[in-house]
């Protein structure tokens, strides 16, 4: 469950890779802080352990703003607040009362459990990152392994690793996911450019050993230019087929997660099917031929899938990485003609697309390689 304002969004598909919370007191009103919820046993009569559960909160940033865990007094939460679970992060109001500080939950901002996500408005690339396991500041985001992020103009959603690795290990080729953030603030551009060179490049180098279909929608122009420059330098020309305009179009990202359970398999008139899946890296479209589908019908299925994918992108407000697995050996020249029509269709709805690479037979290897790493 993800709480954005008063709206609850289901992002349970991200629970397998842990939780990262990004928050900062500087962006919050005076007296507000971020708190960590821990489970404790209370004491009953005669000092015996009570069977009733109590929940305490440990503010990660104090009202003085000195740093994490400098205000670690545990506070008992009662009443309806008991819906909280161990590991939750909450937004709290910290009120000075003489030599003590009282902590109150801010209604409507109960955030997450240890396997959930949280969104705080108004964040920038300079904000603090907290892990529910460590609760410490991570410098420059560079210690984070398997970080996948999505960002709107005023909100950010992050998923993170089960464990942290030191920077020197993260810089090696052990990365299992693309690392990408959508950030519009100027402060984030230089960081993301360097991150592309350090982290995305080694992953791309391994992936682009095979022809690969990757559609990138909804990213910052400067970041996209940086990745394109790297591709021209490092990626074999045979793996780069089509280059189209970059984009700066943002949709409601929470539709991405809710759409993952809506019509996952779409029948095609040609007799094939298209399976849609939301993975840790983005959306994947798997076009299947079905039983007894002839070669000519396979070509029709691939062409039909192009327009079906365009329809799904518009319907589900997709952005980010979109991976497409076509059927068998197809005519790439004919496919390119269809792709031009496809991009024109999406651009009519304010989408701008960059197609990094398109191929008929290389994507399956990439998807299987990624899944085998994540299992």
Curated annotation (Swiss-Prot):
MF GO annotations: endonuclease activity; metal ion binding; RNA binding; RNA nuclease activity
A Pfam family reported for this protein in Swiss-Prot or TrEMBL: RNase_E_G
Cofactor dependence: Mg(2+)
Swiss-Prot/TrEMBL GO biological process terms: mRNA processing; rRNA processing
Superkingdom of origin: Eukaryota
Keywords associated with the record: Chloroplast, Endonuclease, Hydrolase, Magnesium, Metal-binding, mRNA processing, Nuclease, Plastid, RNA-binding
Keyword Hydrolase: yes
One term under GO cellular component: chloroplast stroma
InterPro entries cross-referenced by the UniProt entry: RNA-bd_AU-1/RNase_E/G, RNase_E/G
Residues at which Mg(2+) binds: 286, 325
Metal-binding recorded as keyword: yes
EC number(s) stated in the UniProt entry for this protein: 3.1.26.-
Subcellular location: Plastid, Chloroplast stroma
Leading EC class: hydrolase
Co-factor binding comment: Binds 1 Mg(2+) ion per subunit.
The protein's role, per its UniProt record: Involved in intercistronic processing of primary transcripts from chloroplast operons. The endonucleolytic activity of the enzyme depends on the number of phosphates at the 5' end, is inhibited by structured RNA, and preferentially cleaves A/U-rich sequences.
Record-stated family: Belongs to the RNase E/G family.
Identification of the protein by name: Ribonuclease E/G-like protein
Origin species: Nephroselmis olivacea
């Amino acid at each position: 469950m993800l709480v954005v304002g008063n709206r609850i969004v289901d992002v349970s598909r991200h629970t397998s890779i842990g939780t990262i919370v990004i928050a900062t007191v500087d962006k919050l009103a005076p007296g507000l802080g971020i708190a960590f919820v821990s489970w404790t046993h209370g004491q009953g009569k005669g000092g015996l352990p009570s069977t009733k559960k109590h929940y305490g909160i440990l503010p990660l940033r104090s009202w003085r703003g000195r740093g994490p865990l400098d205000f670690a007094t545990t506070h008992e939460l009662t009443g309806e607040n008991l819906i909280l679970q161990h590991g939750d992060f909450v937004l709290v109001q910290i009120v000075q009362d003489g030599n003590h500080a009282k902590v109150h939950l801010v209604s409507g901002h109960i955030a997450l459990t240890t396997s959930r996500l949280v969104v705080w408005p108004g964040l920038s690339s300079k904000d603090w990152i907290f892990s529910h396991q460590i609760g410490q500041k991570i410098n420059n985001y560079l210690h984070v392994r398997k970080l996948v992020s999505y960002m709107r103009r005023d909100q950010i959603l992050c998923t993170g690793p089960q464990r942290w690795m030191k920077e020197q290990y993260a810089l090696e080729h052990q990365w299992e996911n693309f690392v990408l953030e959508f950030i519009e603030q100027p402060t984030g551009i230089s960081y993301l450019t360097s991150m592309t060179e350090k982290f995305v490049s080694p992953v791309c180098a391994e992936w682009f050993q095979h022809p690969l279909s990757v559609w990138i929608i909804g990213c910052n122009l400067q970041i996209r230019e940086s990745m394109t420059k790297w591709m021209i330098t490092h990626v074999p020309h045979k793996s780069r087929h089509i280059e189209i305009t970059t984009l700066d179009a943002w949709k409601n990202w929470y539709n991405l997660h809710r759409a993952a359970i809506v019509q996952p398999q779409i029948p095609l008139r040609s007799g094939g099917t298209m399976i849609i899946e939301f993975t840790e890296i983005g959306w994947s479209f798997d076009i299947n031929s079905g039983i007894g589908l002839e070669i000519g019908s396979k070509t029709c299925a691939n062409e039909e899938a192009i327009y079906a994918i365009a329809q799904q992108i518009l319907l589900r407000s997709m952005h980010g990485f979109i991976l497409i697995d076509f059927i068998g050996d197809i005519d790439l020249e004919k496919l390119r003609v269809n792709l031009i029509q496809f991009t024109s269709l999406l651009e009519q709805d304010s989408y701008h697309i960059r197609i990094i690479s398109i191929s008929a037979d290389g994507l399956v290897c990439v998807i299987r390689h990624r899944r085998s790493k994540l299992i």
